[in-house]
């Protein structure tokens, strides 16, 4: 009996070791005790790039885009040539609405002109002033391909300022499974098959025609470096990988 327990203990230990080394998590936490550290690393890091319209500050609400609610875009991300398949997620809130109210989360980020992303957007459709949806885009050399993920009112509808929402994408090769955080839970939004181009890349966030604040952006998967800073966004672990990130 003792030998069986010994074998079981060894197996569990090895499994936990593999999990911690093969699937780490990296969270840029913009509202916790180390928000300034994460802001500096994300905005001024060696692998960071952003577009010309960018202007970023750290406020009590998190990583905050400027208050220009015109149609100009702001986007920022970190490149990572060796990141392949992973899950990226961010929680955010709108501080001020404009015309389209876009909040973006980027994956396979190469730079500001080459990336994949998915976004919230509000369009006027046949006079409907409250037509919210989630869309996907692929940007190559500054040129876009785009399409719809969902406009299901049970997932995304009537979004408000100063309310926490989230976007999550599980990236597997060229497929991204998208979820939206609304009403205190994650909801499956749909899947995207991106038309080729990028097999690796980093993560980022962006916005257009609204002011947005991001509480955190997190990425996990094989090859993602872990960090040792506890993340306590919204008074709890920022992601489902929070315990793993802490090395527990």
Regions found by a protein language model. Give the residues of each.
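Bacterial N-terminal signal peptides that target proteins for export
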Residues: 1-10
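Bacterial N-terminal signal peptides
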Residues: 9-18
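Extracellular carbohydrate-recognition regions
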Residues: 22-50, 229-242
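Carbohydrate-binding surfaces in secreted/extracellular proteins
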Residues: 30, 90, 159-192, 217
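Extracellular glycan-recognition surfaces and repeat-rich motifs
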Residues: 34-73
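Secretory/extracellular carbohydrate-interaction modules
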Residues: 67-142
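Short, aromatic/His-centered strand-loop micro-motif at the edge of beta-sheets
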Residues: 141-168
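Flexible glycan-contacting loops in extracellular carbohydrate-active proteins
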Residues: 189-218
């Amino acid at each position: 009996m003792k030998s069986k327990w010994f074998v079981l203990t060894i197996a569990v230990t090895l499994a936990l070791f593999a999990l911690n080394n093969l699937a780490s998590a990296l969270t840029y936490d913009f509202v916790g005790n180390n928000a300034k550290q994460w802001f500096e690393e994300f905005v001024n890091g060696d692998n960071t790039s952003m577009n010309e319209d960018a202007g970023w500050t750290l406020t009590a609400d998190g990583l905050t885009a400027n208050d220009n609610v015109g149609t100009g875009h702001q986007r920022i991300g970190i490149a990572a040539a060796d990141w392949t398949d992973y899950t990226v997620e961010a929680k955010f809130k709108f501080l001020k609405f404009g015309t389209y109210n876009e909040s973006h989360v980027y994956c396979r980020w190469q730079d500001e002109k080459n990336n994949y992303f998915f976004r919230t957007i509000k369009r006027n459709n046949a006079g409907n002033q409250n037509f919210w949806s989630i869309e996907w885009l692929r940007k190559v050399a500054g040129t876009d391909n785009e399409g719809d993920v969902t406009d299901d009112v049970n997932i995304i509808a009537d979004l408000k300022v100063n309310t926490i929402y989230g976007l999550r994408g599980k990236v597997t090769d060229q497929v991204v499974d998208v979820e939206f955080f609304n009403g205190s839970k994650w909801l499956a939004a749909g899947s995207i098959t991106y038309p080729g181009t990028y097999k690796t890349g980093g993560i980022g966030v962006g916005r257009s025609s609204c002011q947005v604040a991001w509480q955190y952006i997190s990425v996990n998967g094989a090859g993602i470096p872990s960090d040792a800073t506890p993340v306590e966004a919204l008074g709890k672990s920022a992601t489902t990988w929070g315990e793993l990130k802490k090395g527990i």
